[in-house]
């Protein structure tokens, strides 16, 4: 099961005891996964809702029953050729009070002889912070998804209304987040791409298990990146050390074969002889072999002097 499906399963099991939050969540669910169907004339509407998640279907059934005393029928549709998940179809008819429900969730405003549909987030239902959290939970259940954090950080809500996408973005950003909107194939996508912001939104929607899973993945990925960075740094440093040692030995050999090591001052000759004898020794180890011992910086200084002498010999600035 995908991370997104697991997250939705967790959110679908959350059921608020407060009627105001139930209404806010149902309003979002109808807006995101519902369609309105005109039947028998302009004054009659059906609400059709579809989902692939059985837990969401159960939640819709319970919300309609608890809020409006409506027992909706859940029909299961499956296309065996496509081998996809079941589709759960629910219909609230005009006779079951669909118009009244749409008015209660602030999607529909009934005029004398017509309907006025509201496409924005119903702010009248979201006076309390808990209701705003419930609305976001319903919006995610109805039209949201979150990517597998092992691959990328991305959470989105897909809606067909530009007005709704803007008000949904504003609602999310009221929680100090920075969601954005992009148009995709005729729909509007409200999205977050930062891992810490997705964690915050999961917390707002109360998907605590999904939040912990995402945090664990983030910590693991950070540790892996840190280890890789350290290994790369140490590898680069080791490569520089090896290259320097090879250069030092080549220069000492050049001096030895041209003017002889006796040409060097005693302090340089001593370190040159030890460098030739202990090719794999570190600067610290070379310094400890001298008498008296000197530190890494002292060893490095002497070896650089030897490099300069070898260069001058090669350039003919010192006569053999």
Curated annotation (Swiss-Prot):
Q: Name one Pfam family in it.
A: LAGLIDADG_WhiA
For biological process, the GO terms are: cell division; regulation of sporulation
Per the record, DNA-binding region residues lie at: 282-315
Matching InterPro entries, A to Z? Homing_endonucl, Sporu_reg_WhiA_N_dom, Sporulation_regulator_WhiA, Sporulation_regulator_WhiA_C, WhiA_LAGLIDADG_dom
Give the record's keywords alphabetically.
Cell cycle, Cell division, DNA-binding
Which Gene3D superfamilies did the record assign? Homing endonucleases
UniProt keyword annotation of Cell cycle present: yes
State one molecular function term (GO). Answer: DNA binding
Name the protein family: Belongs to the WhiA family.
HAMAP family under this entry? HTH_type_WhiA (MF_01420)
Task performed by this protein = Involved in cell division and chromosome segregation.
- What this protein is called in its record is Probable cell division protein WhiA
Q: Which organism is it from?
A: Alkaliphilus oremlandii (strain OhILAs)
Q: What high-level taxonomic lineage is stated for the organism?
A: Bacteria, Bacillati, Bacillota, Clostridia, Peptostreptococcales
Q: Gene encoding this chain?
A: whiA
């Amino acid at each position: 099961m995908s991370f997104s499906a697991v997250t939705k399963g967790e959110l679908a099991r959350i059921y608020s005891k407060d009627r105001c939050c139930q209404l806010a969540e149902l309003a979002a669910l109808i807006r995101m996964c519902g369609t309105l169907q005109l039947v028998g004339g302009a004054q009659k509407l059906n609400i059709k809702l579809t989902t692939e998640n059985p837990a969401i279907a159960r939640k819709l059934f319970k919300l309609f029953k608890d809020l409006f005393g409506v027992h909706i029928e859940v029909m299961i549709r499956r296309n065996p050729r496509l081998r996809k998940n079941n589709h759960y179809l629910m219909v609230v008819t005009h006779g079951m009070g669909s118009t009244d429900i749409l008015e209660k969730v602030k999607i529909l405003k009934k005029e004398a002889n017509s309907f006025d549909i509201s496409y924005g987030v119903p702010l009248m239902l979201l006076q309390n912070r808990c209701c705003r959290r419930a609305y976001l939970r319903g919006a995610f259940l109805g039209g949201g998804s979150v990517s597998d954090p092992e691959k990328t950080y991305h959470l989105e809500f897909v809606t067909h209304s530009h007005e709704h996408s803007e008000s949904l973005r504003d609602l999310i950003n009221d929680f100090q987040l920075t969601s954005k909107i992009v148009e995709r194939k005729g729909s509007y996508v409200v999205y977050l791409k930062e891992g810490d912001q997705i964690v915050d939104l999961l917390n707002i929607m109360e998907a605590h298990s999904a939040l912990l899973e995402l945090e664990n993945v983030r910590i693991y990925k950070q540790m892996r990146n840190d280890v890789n960075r350290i290994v790369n740094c140490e590898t680069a440093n080791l490569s520089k050390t090896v290259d320097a040692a090879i250069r030092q030995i080549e220069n000492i050999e050049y001096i030895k074969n041209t003017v002889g090591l006796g040409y060097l001052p005693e302090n340089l000759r001593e370190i040159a002889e030890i460098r030739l004898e202990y090719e794999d020794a570190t600067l610290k180890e070379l310094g400890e072999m001298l008498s008296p011992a000197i530190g890494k910086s002292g060893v490095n200084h002497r070896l650089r002097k030897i490099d300069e002498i070898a260069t001058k010999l090669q350039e003919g600035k010192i006569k053999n």
